[in-house]
Swiss-Prot record:
SUPFAM superfamilies: SET domain. Belongs to the class V-like SAM-binding methyltransferase superfamily. Histone-lysine methyltransferase family. Suvar4-20 subfamily. This is Histone-lysine N-methyltransferase SET9. Gene3D superfamilies: Histone-lysine N-methyltransferase, SET domain. Residues 114-228 form the SET domain. Keywords: Chromatin regulator, Chromosome, Methyltransferase, Nucleus, S-adenosyl-L-methionine, Transferase. The gene is SET9. Residues 653-662 have a biased composition (Basic residues).
Amino acid sequence: MPPSKAEKRGLTLEKLASYDDVITDALVDKIYYWATIRKNRGTRFTASRGLQEEDIAGVIREQVIWDKDPVEAVQQLLDLPGLRKYMKGLRDEKDQDQFKRHLRRYVNIYMPDCPFEVTTTNRYTITDHEASITARRDINPREEIKYLTGVQVAMTEEQEKTLELARKDFSLVISSRKKTRSLFLGPARFANHDCDANARLSTKGYDGMQIVAVKPINEGDEITVSYGDDYFGDNNEECLCHTCEDRQQNGWAPMKRVEDSDDEDMEEAESPVENPSEATSSGTATSGGKRARDITEEDAGADLPPTSKRARIEKKPSPTKARASDHLREATLKKVHSTSSLRREMPVSSIEDPSANINVTSPQMTQDIRNQQRDGLLTVSLDETSSSRESTPQSPLMAASPKSSHSTDATSVDDEHHVDSLPKIKVEPEVVHENPALGVATVKEEVITTTVNAPWPSPPAEDDEMSDLSELSDSMEFDSVKQQIVKRKFRPTLRTTRSKSRYEVHNRVGTPVSSAVGQDGEWVENPRKPGDYMTSSSLLSAKFSKWVECQTCDVQFVQQDGYNTRKECPRCERHSKLYGYAWPKTEREGKHDKEERITDHRIVHRFVDPDEERELKRGKTKKILKESIRERFSTPRSGRESMSASVEVDSGRKRRRVRKTM
């Protein structure tokens, strides 16, 4: 009899994600864990109410730690109400076997010979604790870290969106052999990234994963692997690992680049559709906009030589392109009007030939034209057929001039004036030339020829180099409400650099502070500082939260609701509840070891003695602890300040002052 389709099916993505969520909730979150493991299905996962903390911890303690029988532990765990109900939902026998194998991977991490322990770290989000792996003993290079394994399943982008893994991609790996993206789950997924990792991921079998040490790992060190060169942005520029913190690079760099947002796309998305029928006939706005952006990016990526002649338009533009050009002309006219008539008052005589000595306009006529221009009586007429992409070659000096980006208003006189007998002036606004070498996309030039009916006769216009344009001073501006020129108001600007006297000393240690502005964005101060996950005041936001030093591992931690001070950190306290020994001990170390295992964790007093508690409340120990944390996680800025202070002590001025007092 041929096998059915159900028997042919293997481990799928949805099944593995569901198995891992249920097992991590049962065997990690509900065993004295002080945080919550991030689930693969996000908000769609609901914890089982049939799993109690003491029931699961009792099975792990008796069957795994004391008797070292993980097989019996798996069977007893499946007899608990929550897991028994979940197993009944798996009707296929093969699915039940896969769930048992995945459950066994998590049961093994509580074996006494397991060299690691699942802990947490707040390095990445400061206020939220995420899972991590800490070594419980010394690990040699090229040693397979026992029980730190996982399983992978190939996936597609559609499945990734279905499981809402876009923001939870820390369990996604790309196989260098198969060149496919896979979902990687199991105890090994708790290993975080480091640019100088002490371990690596390797395949084992068909779909298995194993972590192997590449460097000596000491007891208490975090076990890390490398996720890739571009996992956290380009060249891992957003990485917050321990190595980047020591080197003050990537996510820990003193200065951070600000990426420019696409304001035009946002305005286009927010603007309503004027003609729904046209939008429907031409396709959806999203798809059309995406195609347009793709074409733009493709054109911008090509290396275009500086063109001296503009390409002629030989084909009639399509309706879509015509609408785009209409929006472009509206934006151009708005920009021209805002940058010429209001900001820069230009006398009429400035566009005339100075050498011609022709005085055909009186001051009264000039004033009338300006008043009509400001009151909106002068209208703009565009000739659709006169649009051209042809222009004369421009000199590099004119292209680089900042004045070339501004142009005069294209205006025409209303019906009160005789426009038939008046000459016509063609005004071609200048186009800003971008330097392709500065990383800016080269845009093809496009000029819209505008016909201006001037109310006065004028000789033929000459080159721009011969015209003398007068403009307002930088300290003056035109007030559109009062219709007069007023003094420009001071607008404070954000400082992106430090003063010279400060950063010269600061550059002696650490990464130099750049005072330049990047070509594709500004540099601002990075909000993340080295050690801020230990020194941040947001950690003590609760009323009775405080810093406490663990009496077992000498690590500082924040105790929430610290009415009474605890002796141990959450990691050491969880370890002692399970194994009955102080961290990192899991069993007797030989026949000469006479220390008894504590089988009932409830008999252990978890808080400090009353005398020590009184000392802590006086504030002396608390102040010393804060100073030690500040010195341990001091930023390079504080180190530089201490260096500058030491230089001042050794200076001659200081020595002379000492000699005078003596």
